[in-house]
Amino acid sequence: MRPMLPILALAAAAVPLAATAVARPETPKQALTAAIAAPTRTPTNVARDKYRHPAETLAFFGVKPSDTVVEVWPGGGWYTEILAPYLARTGTYYAAAPLPNGAKGVQALQARDAARYAKVRIAGFPAKPGDATVPDGGADVVLTFRNVHNWRFGGADQAQAMFDAMFRMLKPGGTLGVVEHRLPEVRDAAAEEKSGYLKESSVIGFATKAGFKLAGRSEVNANPRDTADWPQGVWTLPPSYRLGDTDRAKYAAIGESDRMTLRFVKPR
């Protein structure tokens, strides 16, 4: 039996080493990968990862697990399913939308999985009297995905007011990340009124007028097959398919819209 003692000693010594390896904290990249790969995500949302590129997009915006992040107008909660668990341990996630209707998608997620979304904070944006709000200067990152065209439909002044409000939300040095359907710069600006597409120069104009500095552009959400001249605007393409079965295979082959991905910073 004596020859077994060194082997047993080695095995015993390996236990704390293994425990140390298990206890090693995740890197931000690992935490984001885990959030994106979570089996709790809605399957139809997962199917759109190939168009929305959440890992690359959030990495470009520099979102860290310890950040206070405001998602403006989260809609059905596509990014909520990723951001809320990613930020749950050491960060904060705000879903900011017109209340009560604008938060219904996020509230549905909370009803489905209360534990996973327990720390989500819902705020009015624009806020009405009595709404919870995001404190001015309280956010490290503000994100909005494919919403600027909706604000533009209300007029340039409304869109500008939204950018002004997002500027106030951020700490000095904070980041604004914008993803939006992209209209080619050579097109008539009138197309912005109804197509759902905006020129990059228009979005940059709203942001810089609010006080932001453009810090970077990414083509991660680009789609060169999208010519942005469809009969029902951007909603002709998936996932909306506003024409129903008419030319559906054609539009499916094109895929989701061509999108700008812009990172702005609030000067210190």
What is each model feature region?
Residues 32-64:
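Class I SAM-dependent methyltransferase Rossmann-like catalytic core
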Residues 65-75:
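Conserved class I S-adenosyl-L-methionine
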Residues 84, 158-172:
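A short glycine-rich, Lys/Arg-flanked "PGG" loop and its adjoining helix->strand segment in the class I
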Residues 105-131:
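S-adenosyl-L-methionine
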Residues 132-142:
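A short acidic, Gly/Pro-enriched loop at the edge of an enzyme's catalytic core
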Residues 173-181:
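Conserved beta-strand signature within the Rossmann-like core of class I S-adenosyl-L-methionine
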Residues 189-217:
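Conserved Class I S-adenosyl-L-methionine
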Residues 247-268:
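C-terminal lobe and adjacent flexible extensions of AdoMet/dcAdoMet transferase-like proteins
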